[in-house]
């Protein structure tokens, strides 16, 4: 069950309080174009799709995943703090030490230094199970058991964030392509394009 996996993750991270909510971020773009960040939420009852969020990333150098993750984390948690929303017990970043460092710095600046941040770095050949897991700003990855419920949970949350980011990116790309196709047709005005 998800609850058992959250207990396992609590033990794996050696936290005092049992984890009840995890949020995970991922970035999707095509060579820096139409960059989307996604955040998914998981609680004891499973994924909470009402808390999923996507962010259109702008004002950064195309392809700069560090700036993109920073913008998404900053926007998401500054709003959550402002609105008094329940914060996660753990934040997961689909990325290595660089993305993790940026996310942790953003959390610290927002006064959320007490929330652990995990980075999942892709392993050799990007194969599932070969990723390295980093906690906060530790230099060495955490030692992990290959088939533990905690690792499985992190992989599932990461994969869901990845899926949500990619579907958002593809929708944005499709919308742009459709819009440019309509603009090239003579005789179609602004009112027709909207419909």
Identify the role of each PLM range:
Residues 1-195:
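Acidic, glycine-enriched active-site microenvironments
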């Amino acid at each position: 069950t998800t609850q058992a996996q959250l207990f396992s993750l609590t033990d794996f991270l050696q936290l005092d309080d049992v984890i009840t909510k995890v949020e995970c971020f991922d970035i999707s773009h095509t060579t820096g174009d139409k960059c989307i960040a996604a955040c998914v939420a998981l609680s004891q009852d499973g994924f909470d799709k009402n808390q999923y969020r996507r962010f259109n990333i702008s004002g950064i150098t195309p392809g700069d995943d560090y700036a993109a993750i920073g913008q998404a984390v900053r926007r998401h948690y500054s709003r959550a703090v402002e609105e008094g929303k329940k914060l996660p017990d753990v934040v997961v970043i689909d990325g290595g030490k660089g993305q993790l460092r940026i996310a942790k710095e953003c959390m610290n600046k927002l006064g959320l230094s007490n929330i652990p941040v995990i980075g999942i770095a892709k392993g050799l050949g990007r194969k599932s199970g070969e990723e390295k897991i980093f906690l906060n700003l530790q230099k060495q990855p955490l030692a992990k058991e290959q088939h533990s419920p905690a690792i499985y949970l992190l992989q599932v949350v990461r994969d869901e964030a990845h899926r949500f980011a990619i579907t958002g990116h593809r929708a944005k790309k499709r919308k742009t392509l459709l819009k440019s196709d309509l603009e090239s047709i003579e005789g179609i005005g602004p009112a027709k394009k909207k419909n």
